[in-house]
Design a protein with these regions (language model features):
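Active-site loop/oxyanion-hole signature of alpha/beta-hydrolase fold enzymes
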Residues: 18-21, 28, 65-104
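Conserved HGGG/HGGXW glycine-rich cap/lid loop of the alpha/beta-hydrolase fold
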Residues: 23-74
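Conserved catalytic-core motifs of eukaryotic protein kinase domains, centered on the activation segment
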Residues: 50-52, 75-80, 138-141
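Flexible "cap/lid" loop of the alpha/beta hydrolase fold
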Residues: 114, 118-119, 125-157
């Protein structure tokens, strides 16, 4: 099946309003059965569409949820820290009656997955991390390291295509 067809089969975006943090978070939810669902957290510059192949593969097998992190997809931009975002993930899952999930995080989503799993461990059945690391053990509230500041600045100034081409050159 062609990628365009797979994208077109994605579940529609839904919006969760977190009143604790006053933020709207977009997400996709493909409910299949009452088994433990799989929650996917995307990497930097990704969104819930990043998991299109996983939605396609698990259709008819498992329930799948993919959340757009703040500032990605249709989620409100925010400067919230990862602990706060992990609480939003927890609140969103509670709002859709998910009491346990298998958690998959890629890159930045993997860093978030580690925090979700450590702070909301009763919610997590399994954790799978892809292309992530534990961070640099920097104190909460520390400024980002220079390479990440530069990447964020480049992202603000470029179109999706320009930024994608730049990132490919740097791989």
């Amino acid at each position: 099946m062609h990628f365009t067809e797979i994208i077109n089969q994605l579940p529609q975006l839904k919006i969760f309003k977190d009143n604790t943090y006053n933020i709207q978070i977009s997400y996709r939810y493909q409910k299949f059965n009452e088994e433990i669902p799989i929650l996917f957290l995307h990497g930097f510059n990704g969104n819930s569409k990043s998991w299109a192949y996983q939605f396609h593969y698990f259709k008819g097998r498992r329930s799948v949820i993919a959340i757009d992190a703040p500032g990605f997809g249709q989620s409100d931009p925010s400067d919230l820290d990862m602990l706060s975002i992990s609480n939003i993930v927890y609140n969103l899952l509670k709002s859709i009656d998910v009491t346990k999930c298998d958690l998959v995080g890629h890159s930045m989503g993997g860093m978030l997955a580690q925090i979700v799993a450590s702070k909301h461990s009763k919610l997590i059945n399994k954790v799978i991390l892809s292309c992530t690391h534990k961070g640099y053990a920097m104190p909460v509230g520390s400024s980002l390291r220079d390479p990440y500041k530069l990447r964020l600045e480049e992202r603000k100034q470029m179109s999706n295509k320009e930024f994608g081409q730049l990132r490919i050159q740097k791989m």
